[in-house]
């Protein structure tokens, strides 16, 4: 498991690296948000440990920005105890867990393992096409081991396409699934949602069969 640690405190950073490496994890440690963004762009990380107070910005605001941009790496926030209340109120912004400083290293390792188990267990109850997974129970989607942030319409659209993967799904069927009976539907509503879905899962995964509907390719 590859972990990106974003922590500016030298003493704490060294201690975290040492403890996590002894526990069997691979660590990459950076001290600035800018460096974290560069590392994220290169990929290959399974989890991030993110300090909130960093020299070049606020970690929580950066978390919100990352999630808004579709960055779905699991993130455990590290925060000073006096920021817990505001942190709890912000977990909906995308943090997977948090720890208040000072914390015991064994507790951190347990939290990391717990998040890893949750992510690994995701695929056990999903439909899958290559690296694309859909969990119909929890209404979640993963691509390349990262959670995708889909709108409700995008999720239902993908659900129907994956249910019928390898076959053409008629536009009328998709519109019925998305909008139901009696709903007013703009002429290009389906195309707009399909465009947004393709942008998130990869435009080449879905084939347009002109005049008929759409087909989600099997891997």
UniProtKB/Swiss-Prot annotation:
Please list the coiled coil stretches: none
Q: Name one GO molecular function term.
A: phosphorelay response regulator activity
- In its UniProt entry, the species of origin is given as Serratia marcescens
- Family matches, as CDD domains: REC_OmpR_PmrA-like, trans_reg_C
Q: Which residues carry this modification: 4-aspartylphosphate?
A: 51
Protein name, as recorded? Swarming motility regulation protein RssB
Q: Does the keyword Transcription apply?
A: yes
Question: One Pfam annotation, family name?
Answer: Trans_reg_C
Where does the record place the Response regulatory domain? 2-116
Give me any GO biological process, just one: regulation of DNA-templated transcription
| Locations listed in the record | Cytoplasm
Q: Tell me, in a sentence or two, what this protein's role is.
A: Member of the two-component regulatory system RssA/RssB involved in regulation of swarming motility which has been shown to be inhibited by saturated fatty acids. RssA/RssB regulates cellular fatty acid composition, hemolysin production and cell surface topography. RssA/RssB negatively regulates the activity of SlhBA. It can also act as a negative regulator for the control of the swarming initiation. RssB binds its own promoter.
DNA binding happens at which residues? 124-218
Write down the superkingdom of origin. Bacteria
Following inactivation of the gene, the phenotype reported is:
Mutation in either rssA or rssB confers a precocious-swarming phenotype on LB agar: swarming occurs at 37 degrees Celsius and is initiated at a lower cell density and more rapidly than the swarming of the parent strain at 30 degrees Celsius. Both mutants also exhibit increased hemolysin activity and altered cell surface topology.
Q: Which UniProt keywords apply?
A: Cytoplasm, DNA-binding, Phosphoprotein, Transcription, Transcription regulation, Two-component regulatory system
Q: Which GO terms describe its cellular component?
A: cytosol; protein-DNA complex
């Amino acid at each position: 498991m590859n972990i990106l640690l974003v922590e500016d405190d030298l003493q704490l950073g060294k201690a975290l690296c040492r403890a996590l490496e002894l526990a069997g994890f691979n660590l990459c440690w950076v001290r600035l948000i800018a460096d974290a963004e560069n590392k994220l762009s290169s990929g290959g990380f399974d989890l991030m440990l993110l300090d909130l107070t960093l020299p070049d910005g606020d970690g929580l605001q950066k978390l919100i920005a990352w999630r808004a941009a579709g960055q779905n790496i699991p993130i455990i926030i590290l925060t000073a105890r006096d920021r817990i209340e505001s942190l709890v109120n912000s977990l909906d912004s995308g943090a997977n867990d948090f720890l208040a400083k000072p914390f015991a290293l064994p507790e951190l390792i347990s939290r990391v393992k717990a998040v890893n188990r949750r992510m690994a267990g995701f695929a056990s109850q999903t439909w899958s096409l290559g690296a694309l997974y859909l969990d119909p129970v929890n209404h979640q989607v993963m691509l390349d081991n990262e959670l995708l942030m889909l709108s409700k319409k995008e999720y239902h659209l993908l659900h129907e396409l994956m249910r019928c993967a390898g076959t053409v799904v008629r536009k009328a069927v998709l519109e019925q699934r998305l909008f139901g009976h009696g709903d007013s539907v703009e002429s290009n509503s389906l195309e707009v949602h399909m465009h947004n879905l393709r942008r998130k899962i990869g435009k080449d995964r879905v084939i347009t069969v002109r005049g008929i509907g759409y087909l989600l390719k099997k891997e």
